[in-house]
């Protein structure tokens, strides 16, 4: 959700961070300097506006207390007007007759508050005119004005870093019929999307070069758009509905239908909009999206203080009223240039919801709050055709997007592409080709053969700018059979015959230049999870063994859980275009080995288990888990499982990670879990509910599952599979995490082999991965380095210590959720759809052993062993730039000024 922007000068960056910290401390009390309009006096009658479960007003006297009255005259809410003269009442029941009352008994006229039905209460709002080129404002159903810019294919947008003048010369000379009406796409996000210079973090230019008009729209509460910001609230989603229907009615829009396109924020927003199925929405193509908030913000139950928290801080900063130092820079530029509408629209920006308080209040899964924000809970409602692309190792949104494929059941016209790589690799040449075909067929209603000429001609320029490749590194589009069809019907038939899931392997090794965004080969499947997948188990054993055979003897090993043992992140350079997104020559990996003296658990900071060399090629596609029988010296401990490939040449390649806070170890075996599916052996789903939080039992081993994120990796015969268990940190470019450690590191012990009184009947520590049987690997080992977002290094063995002592074993506490158990979902084989063996039985058996905290079974009410005060202290350090990031490393994705990014 970030991109290659110009860094702020250090002084301005520091000033904005300090300003943000002060704002947080004063509860967002309206410190912005912008003055909009002339605030009303107490004698003026306020003008109220009824919205969807909201009432709002502007031009009110600052600091006045305003009451919201229902039809009976009863005060249902009251609050103070902010410094901009705005007030917003949320969570208001639908109904007529609401009024606002100012001091002195001055009241507004009555207004109606509406429910969240998709259809507007007055569809004449869609009759407004949208000019076919340039900048303007569109009015939504509740009167809020959204800023937009229309980019026609004859006047392409930019990537925010400028499109060379040769494009201006290409278009007129191709003889392409770029005449109205135009096939049209909408790009919708909370970044500076509508800026006339070209969208920040947008990809409108790519659609322009495909022959599409693009309408770039800024969400309410951002930039020059009116309204107040709240992360994907209902009104933001209904605004998208209104934008779609309004744009589709314009005479310059071909077929009076539109598609949606965008990457990251602009991809996620499509899922939220499409759940309402606007009648004029023809297709969506979400790229590099999230699946749920927890899998990005709270992986495994602990806070992502790296990218995710900083992204939230960016949203807080961007949603403030525009001034010389706050809000989105383009809005201030517009105001300074005389844009009175933009100035007036700042009046509600001070009513933005406190996003940091929302994070604090939802550290655990609360369905009523979380489900509306998690695409996995509602994508089944989407009926429009879908093209989606995501990366297993996406350094920003994370690798859980593929789970959406199994839940997107509302349409049979859906195609998914998955690969290893970085955030922008959903724009790799092969994926871009296929997305172009999709839009041509479902939005333009045209065969893609003619306009593909321009796309192929400009692709090297697009690739160079999107990924920041060096001059002379030319990446072109591959041949495409769909584009060879001469008629629309033939092209559509060929496209719809494509398998629904494409997995590209060894991305970065398919071009003569190592690291270019080109995969070595691909396989296709009918669904995700792959129906043929087999849950394949390797058991952990003594001396770091990882074997398909169960160990006959019990052994104990361990390590010191120390979050500071490795750097917080594994990349030291620019994490955008020209750095992490570039080719191998531009990478700056710092993937550090864990310290290991080999002399005991008090000095080791990790343990690892590694297989013998594989005798056959082994392809893994899907999730998986490390199941551990674990003991901790502290009431809680954070765990990270890292999967790597150890090659015969002595190098080690990163594959994927998984996370869990041990107090969140209870699994959810119902289809009402936060992922809306029950736990299986291959995909254990953490409950994450506060009621299911339990400290670790004292001096006792207990089962803990570490769910792995999605992966797609080819292990060639002769390679070995390794799993390393440690504290979080050091395996991600920009993800970092808070810590449970209460002043000193935890001593963690892992029991391998049979445990407990029942021995072989109890679960053993093991690694389970989804292996696709009989899958060919047609290429040789990729160079090291070359795989995108999969760093490699020289393999270094860890000497797991052997620890003495008795193995006392206890099952997990019972799950306290009361939902009906599910039989699971998704077709698999060889038991891969069964509940996690042993661990599932432990959950239902119940009975926690004695607690680390004098018998108290649960952690404090926050559900975390880190207090919110401590978290705010860590947050302050982040904001002031003294903790995880320096301005040079993270500034390009924090507090941006001006256009300069393709995706965030």
Language model features with spans:
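N-terminal cap/lid segment of alpha/beta-hydrolase-fold proteins
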Residues: 117-180, 614-616
